[in-house]
Design a protein with these regions (language model features):
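N-terminal glycine/serine-rich phosphate-binding loop of ATP-dependent small-molecule kinases
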Residues: 1-95, 157, 238-250, 408, ...
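Active-site core segments that coordinate phosphate-bearing ligands/cofactors
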Residues: 6-7, 118-132, 145-177, 186-203, ...
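Conserved small-residue
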Residues: 17-19, 24, 75, 110, ...
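Active-site phosphate-binding/coordination module
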Residues: 63-141
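Glycine-rich phosphate-binding loop of ATP-grasp-fold ATP-dependent ligases
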Residues: 103, 182-189
């Protein structure tokens, strides 16, 4: 019987499970949707009960899909960095003013806590050095402060505040252990010192969490992949269709699991892994850009971190990101007048809207006699529709489009789609430049996630950044990264680095363009930067008007 591990990944819209053998070969996967409520603009809520139900169904379905039922020795969980609120009995506590306890999760992308974030950032606290100088409203301490101020009844009822990955391991094991990954990256826990910053929490208005001995936010903190307690409980095993006692690894945030799935893959050009030259790009609803340093911590304005041991023990992690990438591309395409017709045509042909758009771009390039990328010479997009996470770290920024025509045909949609994808790629270039300015020498991007299944997205990122882009052999790299956690917890590998070496492998690579096309992207990148400067100038003009 094949020994196997399970990776569970809870993204923004679905819960997925993957079964892998200990060489990283995928045996089966399954996915189940999860529900989301959006009661106000820039708010997003979910249900932890709904999420756990979807996780259990996905694991059961994946196990049933295996050609031969394997011997599962470990399971790892990753999820979005959403905030879960429970009472002392483990029941959901509402995060919504309407009072529905089923809605007890503030989703990672929710920006309701902007006022709290601005107040915290104005304090200039020392801990902010370890989040790029400024907190994001997507982090947990502003959300906790919002909950305390706006829903005091929920605050009083709450006994547990979990990051979603840690909620999953709690459901699996009954242990309230928190992951070093989640606490360091999203909760301002100082991983390099192994402590909470009491003065910071007290100063911003969360001193009661300190007085309670951190009972509600985590006093048992574990390294990623470390085994939790006695493994799967009898009840969790019954729900998941597995055997009690299976090893459960301490969890990770979903993007960081993707980093585990790609950043350490062996490359033929080098016998060793030079992390200073590698960036892991995890492209989905949003995008995350992970780099690690063996040297002293690198403080990069507008880039989260440096986070100690948040992905690999002993290494410092810096994390750039874009709050909306796949979500932005979907928004632009789905809001166009031709979207309904294109969706119907895709259904009729048995393909996707994006494949049809890519086909249209190929036709347009053929007519023009030039490469696809040059079709957007007069059309430019600033992609900050949901603010800018990195490197400007300003959630108040907004997007822009320059070069629109009085047209709503398929060609118009295809060009707007291409310009948006390119804008996302220029955002990645901006982040890479900020990282390289502080000591990194990034020339290779290891990419995974839903966006990396699109060849237009991949080519745009290679050409815009000038980096070689490497894809993993296993396309479900986030699931594989989570499975590595389960393998390490089960003792199949001594540590995460060994698990990465044994289970992750490189696939094909894409080299960046040079010559005329490189100069074209340099020019468009200059426009990208100027679009932001222009937005700031417009704001100043309006502010002067009173």
């Amino acid at each position: 019987m094949t020994r196997a591990v399970i990776g569970v990944d809870v993204g923004t819209g679905s819960a997925r499970a993957g079964i892998f053998d200990l060489a990283g070969r995928r045996l089966a996967t399954a996915s189940r949707p999860i529900r989301m409520w959006k009661p106000e603009a820039e708010w997003a809520e979910q249900s932890s009960d709904d999420i756990w139900t979807a996780v259990c169904a996905a694991v059961r379905e994946a196990m049933e899909a295996c050609a031969e039922r394997p011997e599962v020795v470990g399971i790892g969980f990753d999820a979005t960095c959403s905030l879960v609120v429970l009472d002392a009995a483990g029941r959901p506590v509402t995060v919504d003013p309407e009072g529905d306890d089923a809605r007890n999760v503030i989703v990672w992308m929710d920006h309701r806590a902007i006022d709290q974030t601005d107040r915290i950032n104005a304090g200039g606290y020392e801990v902010l050095r370890y989040v790029g100088g400024r907190l994001s409203p997507e982090m947990q301490t502003p959300k906790l402060l919002w909950l305390k101020e706006q829903l005091p009844q929920s605050w009083g009822r709450a006994a547990h505040f979990f990051d979603l990955p840690d909620f999953l391991t709690w459901r699996a094991t009954g242990a309230t252990r928190r992951s070093l990954c989640s606490l360091v990256c999203k909760w301002t826990y100082l991983g390099h010192e192994g402590r909470w910053d009491d003065a910071y929490l007290s100063a911003i208005g969360l001193g009661d969490l300190v007085e309670e001995g951190y009972a509600r936010i985590g006093s048992d903190v574990g390294a990623v992949g470390s085994a939790i307690g006695g493994g799967l409980t009898v009840e969790a095993a019954r729900q998941l269709g597995l055997t009690p006692g299976i090893a459960v690894g301490t969890s990770m945030i979903d993007a960081h699991a993707g980093g585990i799935g790609v950043i350490g893959v062996p490359l033929a050009a080098s016998a060793t892994v030079d992390y200073d030259r590698r960036l892991a790009l995890i492209g989905g609803t949003s995008s995350c850009h992970m780099v690690m340093s063996l040297a002293a911590p690198r403080f990069i304005p507008g880039v989260w971190g440096p986070y100690h041991s948040a992905m690999l023990p002993g290494l410092w992690l810096n994390e750039g990101g874009q709050s909306a990438t796949g979500a932005l591309i979907d928004h632009v395409v789905q809001g166009h007048p031709r979207h309904a017709d294109l969706t119907a045509e895709a259904t009729r042909r048995g393909t996707t809207v994006y494949q049809l758009l890519n086909d249209e771009l190929a036709v347009l390039a053929g007519r023009s006699g030039g490469p696809v990328a040059m079709l957007t010479r007069d059309l430019h997009v600033l992609p900050d529709f949901h603010g800018n996470r990195s490197p400007r770290a300003d959630a108040s920024l907004r997007g822009a489009v320059s070069g629109l025509r009085l047209s709503d045909g398929l060609e118009d949609l295809a060009l707007l789609y291409l310009a948006t994808v390119q804008a996302v790629a220029y955002g990645t270039r901006h982040i890479v430049a900020a990282m390289n300015d502080t000591g990194y020498a990034i020339d290779t991007i290891l990419a995974c996630g839903g966006g990396t299944k699109n060849p237009v997205f991949l080519e745009a990122h290679a050409d815009a950044t000038g980096c070689t882009l490497v894809l993993p052999e296993e396309p479900e790299a986030v699931l594989l990264g989570s499975a590595v956690l389960g393998a390490v917890a089960a003792g199949a590998f001594p540590d995460i680095a060994a698990g990465m070496a044994g289970m992750t492998h490189a696939g094909r690579s894409i080299e960046p363009a040079d010559g005329r096309l490189r100069a074209y992207h340099d020019a468009k990148y200059s426009v990208f930067l100027r679009l932001h400067d222009d937005q700031m100038a417009y704001r100043a003009l309006m502010a002067a008007a009173g």
